[in-house]
Swiss-Prot record:
Known tissue expression: Expressed in the trachea (at protein level).
Family recorded in the similarity comment: Belongs to the CFAP298 family.
UniProt keyword annotations, A-Z: Cell projection, Cilium, Cytoplasm, Cytoskeleton
Keyword Cytoplasm: yes
Any Pfam family hit: CFAP298
Purpose: Plays a role in motile cilium function, possibly by acting on outer dynein arm assembly. Seems to be important for initiation rather than maintenance of cilium motility. Required for correct positioning of cilia at the apical cell surface, suggesting an additional role in the planar cell polarity (PCP) pathway. May suppress canonical Wnt signaling activity.
Location of this chain's protein in the cell: Cytoplasm; Cytoplasm, Cytoskeleton, Cilium basal body
Protein's name in the database: Cilia- and flagella-associated protein 298
Gene Ontology cellular component annotations, sorted alphabetically: centrosome; ciliary basal body; cytosol; nucleoplasm
A single BP term in Gene Ontology: regulation of cilium movement
Organism: Rattus norvegicus
Complex formation: Interacts with ZMYND10.
Length: 290
């Protein structure tokens, strides 16, 4: 199996393995699904952390309004009254004004937070360092765990406009957000290796050869963005160690310059004529005018 270290730009994303005989059409789709799936997990984790702290999403027409404005406009959060967390709620006001402030109790909050940490770990970039391959099954498992935790804490479900529910139903609207810039459409995705685009009409082995023990770094890119930057000759960690070595070397040279003192040359042991004077018996003779 060929090992693919997938990157976006210079940033590591995940490890994937595939046979050399894999069609690049299929491989590009697989890499893109895992890449977008990881983004989805991270978006959900961010929103579920907010859910644990401040409760469900307010209706769009109530977001950002003060209590006085809501009362004046006679607006009502009907879904908020239905979607009550299991075990009761604790009021924690959302300063941003996106959520209704009726957060789950401490026990239910920990259920959400623990699940979020587990889901993050499953698709973390640290899996690259650990040598763990991330598959679409792992992404789906992380999503299922998050869905299960939300159902435990909110058995009545979430409002239809809550971004968590919309993510689970694949109805999320990312337009105008930073997250939209990160997502790559499957039909628009490109894989690059060694400054060459891996054409979808070919097989992986057409580029990397028949050796199934090959490990390559591929970069996923949106079509039309051009070739990604080449990989640096040394890694960021190696560069850091090199800079540290040169810094230490400069400090050592600086100390040597500071200690370059010639006063030691006046010491008796530095006098190369001392032995001669000793044998001639003229040691310690002081000359002074009368």
């Amino acid at each position: 199996m060929v090992v693919l270290h997938v990157k976006r730009g210079d940033e590591s994303q995940f490890l994937l393995q595939a046979p050399g005989s894999t069609e690049l059409e299929e491989l590009t789709a697989q890499v893109t699904r895992v890449y977008n799936g990881r983004l989805k997990v991270h978006r959900l984790c961010t929103e579920i952390e907010e859910l644990a702290e401040h409760g469900v999403f307010l209706p769009p027409n109530m977001q950002g309004l003060t209590d006085e404005q809501i009362e004046e406009l006679k607006l009502k959060d009907e879904w908020g009254e239905k979607c009550v967390p299991s075990g009761g709620s604790v009021f924690t006001k959302d300063d941003i004004g996106r959520r209704n402030g009726h957060a789950p109790n401490e026990k239910m909050k920990q259920v959400l937070k623990k699940t979020v940490e587990e889901a993050k770990a499953m698709v973390s970039k640290k899996q690259v360092e650990a040598g763990v391959f991330v598959t679409m099954e792992m992404v789906k498992d992380a999503l299922d765990q998050l869905r299960g935790a939300v159902m435990i804490v909110y058995p009545m479900g979430l409002p239809p406009y809550d971004p968590i529910r919309m993510e689970f139903e694949n109805k999320e609207d990312l337009s105008g957000t930073q997250a939209a810039l990160e997502v790559i459409q499957e039909s628009e995705a490109q894989l690059w290796w060694a400054a060459k685009e891996l054409r979808r009409t070919k097989k992986l082995s057409d580029y990397v050869g028949k050796n199934e023990k090959t490990k390559i770094i591929v970069k996923i890119q949106q079509r039309g963005q051009g070739a990604p930057a080449r990989e640096p000759l040394i890694s960021s960690e190696e560069h850091k160690q090199l800079m540290l070595f040169y810094h230490r070397r400069q400090e050592e040279l600086k100390k040597l310059e500071e200690n370059d003192d010639d006063s030691c040359l006046n010491s008796p042991w530095a006098d190369n004529t001392a032995l001669k004077r000793h044998f001639h018996g003229v040691k310690d003779i002081k000359w002074r005018p009368r």
